[in-house]
């Protein structure tokens, strides 16, 4: 049977734990509020930029033959301004720690589902994603990158971009913020090729200034990195929101358990008081 002393220790522990949870929840909320507006504003802008990237790349392909004739090139792969390896890369942006609820696992499930349908190389950001991937023992060429959960590391981003830009097709799997209580897994193709559900409709014809080559070079080098950086910001925002919700849930559970412990301790105290009263009355009768 649980003693009053044990219940007192548990109550003290739960009180401390609740304070810690509320503190971390407040930190997550502050960080989320700090980047929320900028991320959401950038989201719409870069979605449009990515769509333009796709259209430019499609137009570029349709004009390849003409460009090959002009430059007397027989191999079309030489028309790209970055040497690519012809492979597909799956990038999973995870986390280094827990307390993010189920969103990391849900994103991982989408990532693995796509990887199994069409095998390719893998790049993982974050220790948690690496641990999950190793546990499942999936065989795929893998590159792991250390990356912080709560800030943008520009040097690390540059290192990652230098690795992933070599691939013909780059799919990034990450967490997206919908609202404070809802986050969802999402995949973005950052290499300028539309995903299956993004295709459709007639392709517009464009005039390119100063030239098609210059514009493609700009998109392949500069816009590629910007779109990838946005996916990291999106993941960061979604994880802050998920952590806030997870900590709030844990805090409420701690509050409920603390209330139960206090009530149990009071009940034991009443039982002890009643027992002492009965013993007192019994001893008084013996003296009469």
Predicted regions located by residue number:
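C-terminal beta-strand-loop-alpha-helix "lid" module of Rossmann-like NAD(P)-dependent dehydrogenases
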Residues: 1-288
């Amino acid at each position: 049977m649980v003693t009053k002393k044990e219940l007192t220790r548990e109550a003290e522990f739960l009180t401390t734990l609740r304070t810690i949870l509320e503190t971390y929840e407040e930190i997550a909320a502050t960080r989320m509020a700090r980047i929320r507006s900028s991320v959401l504003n950038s989201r719409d802008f870069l979605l449009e930029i990515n769509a333009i990237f796709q259209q430019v790349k499609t137009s570029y392909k349709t004009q390849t033959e003409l460009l090959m004739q002009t430059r007397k090139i027989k191999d079309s792969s030489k028309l790209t301004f970055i040497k690519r390896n012809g492979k597909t890369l799956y990038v999973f942006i995870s986390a280094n720690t827990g307390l993010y609820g189920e969103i990391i696992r849900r994103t991982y499930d989408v990532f693995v589902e796509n990887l199994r349908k069409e095998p390719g190389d893998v790049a993982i950001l974050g220790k948690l994603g690496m641990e999950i991937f190793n546990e499942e023992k999936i065989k795929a060429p893998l590159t792991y990158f250390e990356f912080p959960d709560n800030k943008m590391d520009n040097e690390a981003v540059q290192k990652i971009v230098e690795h992933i830009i070599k691939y013909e097709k780059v799919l990034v799997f990450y967490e997206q913020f919908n609202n404070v209580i809802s986050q969802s897994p999402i995949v973005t193709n950052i290499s300028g090729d539309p995903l299956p559900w993004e295709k459709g409709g007639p392709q517009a014809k464009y005039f390119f200034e100063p030239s098609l080559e210059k514009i493609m070079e700009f998109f392949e080098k500069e816009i590629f990195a910007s779109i990838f950086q946005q996916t990291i910001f999106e993941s960061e925002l979604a994880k802050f929101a998920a952590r806030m919700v997870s900590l709030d849930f844990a805090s409420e559970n701690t509050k409920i358990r603390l209330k139960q412990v206090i009530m149990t301790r009071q009940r034991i105290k009443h039982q002890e008081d009643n027992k002492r009263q009965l013993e007192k009355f019994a001893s008084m009768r013996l003296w009469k």
